[in-house]
A protein has these predicted regions:
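C-terminal interaction appendages of subunits in large macromolecular complexes
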Residues: 389-408, 423-428, 439, 443-445, ...
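GHKL-family ATPase ATP-binding module
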Residues: 1-18, 26, 50, 58-60, ...
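Helical (often loop-to-helix) elements that flank the catalytic cores of nucleotide-handling enzymes
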Residues: 93, 342-355, 553-559, 563, ...
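Conserved short strand/loop->alpha-helix "switch" segment adjacent to the catalytic nucleotide/phosphoryl-transfer site
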Residues: 31-50
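Short conserved segment of the HATPase_c
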Residues: 87-110
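Residues immediately C-terminal
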Residues: 58-59, 86-87, 509-510
Length: 646
């Protein structure tokens, strides 16, 4: 528990009803659930679990909870148990009600706001328990406290059974069991892997905290137990497990100031991509903020000063922040009172004092580390200097691309068949594998709003290439120029010429490879394209089934068999003609339009990226240098090959 205690601020008094503050009522939650949990899709469904777990994490941050259990039961009923102090059960002065009832029925009620109950707290603006209650068909909470077991039951935010004592206990803690309300959610089936990924993240962020997760649903049984004494150091090692480290140690730095603390773990690898993952009070901040800014400033300053000191940088030589972060994996975690997040979803941290704190910690500790480990310091600096030279080469290559670039047809790639429409929100570009398929697509498209760009030959695997190679690659340059938005830090969404970028490749191994190469390119060099939801994969059919005048398409063997049986009806001997599409190039323009390009009849899969760390790991695995981990992954996931790219 020493690491956990080091990273939390212990609140030295009882946690009682007087610590619960009430800010406003619950009425709005069921009317506008998206305001409180982001959406009513699967993302929002899983958010319910995170809200309850966040309350348990708060107990861990305060130094009172060492273990959390999360279970998915039959019927997708969730149970979260912790061994904290237990939610208060005494009377809350402001309302005259039991504090337990207040926590679960009144929005913004919790020990989070005045600093009395918790010095540091995560959760979505403190709305947790009551919002989960409002969006649950039913919810039961049991509290072990004062030697007694208290129980209270709710339905859709209302009390159905008052708080009663149901037994005695020698333990303390809270158990919340709930069933999401199908009236509120598009889907109520939980995905174990999604919850497991989030719980693993929480375990990394709270050193020494044990989190158990299990799936008890019939046919889906699995479980895991996670506890990382090394905290975010182990998180960095986990992310880098299929990369080749530049130095063996994960560099760890931490410090405190008043009621705030920050910790940073970092390690370089021999790749070219930066992975920065930041958190504030255990909440992921994908858009960064002041803590990231403080780290970047300190890193650049320290490496330049060190380079001058050891004579690697001479005169006016210097390395940029981008150079310093090439091949870097870093986790930044800060914990603070009164965290200011920009936006309801807490995507960016706004507390300027965190920039100062992180900058100070990294400046002092990193300088000291480099002094004590000169071989590591030299390796890091030489990598940054090499990145600097490559960046200059990339800039020259980029200028060459820019000189040829522009939004008018004359300067666009010769192979591009552009559309007439100029409003990007109405246009789409099909990036098509092979000239023959490209020809059919050109003839079959609606040229008012559909552009076609055929690709041919062997494409560059950008996972193994620096930016200068990408800019100079004759297979990728047409894609860069056609899209018009630039690459990397120069990517400008306002210049994007199409708001649907559709990858159209055969449904075979070669097609999957092309899709993966393109997705790797977009992920590494045009990530906003994926983050904003502009990238799609066309899903061409595999089979055409005909009986008489009725023709149907099937996208899998299972669907083929089901449609075949449906067409035969009550006559099992009826003849159904089944033909297999071997490739896009075999379809005539009319077929390609009907099956793959007509907005009324086609199937498109939007490529999403909810977990950047997981996406990075998969791209590194599938497209990186190490063969053995890739072989293992493919062998383990071969049965899911149909979904591998999505």
């Amino acid at each position: 528990m020493s690491d956990l205690e080091h990273s939390t601020t212990h609140v030295e008094h009882e946690y009682g009803g007087s610590e619960i503050q009430v800010l406003e009522g619950l009425e709005a939650v069921r009317k506008r659930p998206g305001m409180y949990i982001g959406s009513t899709s699967l993302s929002g469904l899983h958010h319910l679990v995170y809200e309850i777990v966040d309350n348990s994490i708060d107990e861990a941050l305060a130094g009172y909870c060492t273990e959390i259990d999360v279970a998915i039961g039959e019927g997708d009923i969730i149970t979260v148990t912790d061994n904290g102090r237990g939610i208060p059960v005494d009377i809350q002065p402001q309302t005259g009600k039991a504090a337990l009832e207040v926590v679960f029925t009144i929005l913004h009620a919790g020990g989070k706001f005045g600093g009395g109950g918790y010095k540091v707290s995560g959760g979505l603006h403190g709305v947790g328990a009551s919002v989960v209650n409002a969006l649950s068909e039913w919810l039961t909470v049991q509290v072990h406290k004062n030697g007694k077991i208290y129980e209270m039951k709710f339905s859709r935010g209302h009390v159905t059974e008052e708080m009663t004592v149901v037994g005695t206990t020698n333990y303390t803690g809270t158990t919340v069991t709930f069933k999401p309300d199908p009236e509120m959610f598009e889907d109520t089936v939980y995905d174990y892997e999604t919850l497991h990924t989030r719980m693993r993240e929480e375990a990394f962020l709270n050193a020494g905290l044990k989190i158990n997760i299990r799936d008890e649903r019939a046919g889906k049984e699995q479980s895991d137990s996670m506890c990382y004494e090394g905290g975010i150091r182990e998180f960095v090692s986990f992310i880098n497990q299929n990369k080749t480290p530049l130095h063996e140690d994960v560099i760890y730095m931490s410090g405190e100031r008043e009621n705030s603390m920050a910790e940073v773990a970092m390690q370089y690898n021999d790749g070219f991509n930066e992975i920065t993952v930041s958190f504030a009070n255990n909440v992921h901040t994908p858009e960064g903020g002041m803590h990231e800014e403080g780290f970047r400033r300190a890193l650049t300053t320290v490496l330049n000063a060190y380079g001058k000191k050891v004579g690697l940088l001479k005169g006016d030589d210097k390395v940029s922040g981008e150079d310093c972060r090439e091949g870097l994996t870093v986790i930044i975690s800060v914990k603070l009172t009164d965290a200011q997040f920009e936006g309801q979803t807490k995507a960016k941290l706004g507390n300027s004092e965190m920039r100062t704190l992180v900058n100070s910690i990294v400046s002092d500790r990193l300088e000291q580390y480099l002094e004590e480990n000169p071989a590591v310091g030299r390796a890091i600096l030489e990598k940054a200097m090499m990145a600097n030279r490559a960046r200059e080469a990339a800039r020259r290559a980029r200028e060459n691309v820019r000189r040829k670039d522009g939004l008018e047809g004359a300067t666009l790639p010769g192979k591009l068949s552009d559309c007439y429409e100029r409003d990007p929100s109405l246009t789409e570009i099909y990036i098509v594998e092979g000239d023959s398929a490209g020809g059919s697509a050109k003839q079959g498209r609606d040229s008012r709003y559909q552009a076609i760009l055929p690709l041919w030959g062997k494409m560059l695997n950008v996972e193994k290439a620096r930016a200068d190679k990408v800019y100079g690659n004759d297979k990728l340059t047409p894609v860069i120029t056609a899209l018009g938005a630039g690459l990397g830090d120069d990517f400008d969404e306002m210049k994007l010429r199409y708001h649907k970028v559709v990858i159209m490749a055969d449904a075979d191994v070669d097609g999957s490879h092309i899709r993966t190469l393109l997705l790797t390119f977009f992920f590494r060099f045009m990530r906003p394209l994926i983050e904003r939801g502009y990238v799609y994969a066309a899903v061409p059919p595999l089979f055409k089934l005909t009986r008489g005048k009725v023709t149907r398409l099937a996208f899998s063997e299972e669907e083929r068999d089901a449609i075949s049986a449906e067409l035969r009806g009550e006559n099992p001997d009826a003849k159904v003609a089944i033909s297999r599409f071997k490739g896009l190039g075999e379809m005539d323009p009319h077929e390609l339009w009907d099956t793959t390009m007509n907005p009324q009849t086609r199937t498109l899969k939007r490529i999403t990226m909810e977990d950047a760390v997981k996406a990075d790991a998969i791209f590194t695995l599938l497209m990186g240098e190490k063969v053995e981990p890739r072989r293992e992954y493919i062998e383990q996931n071969a049965f899911r090959a149909a979904n591998l790219d999505y």
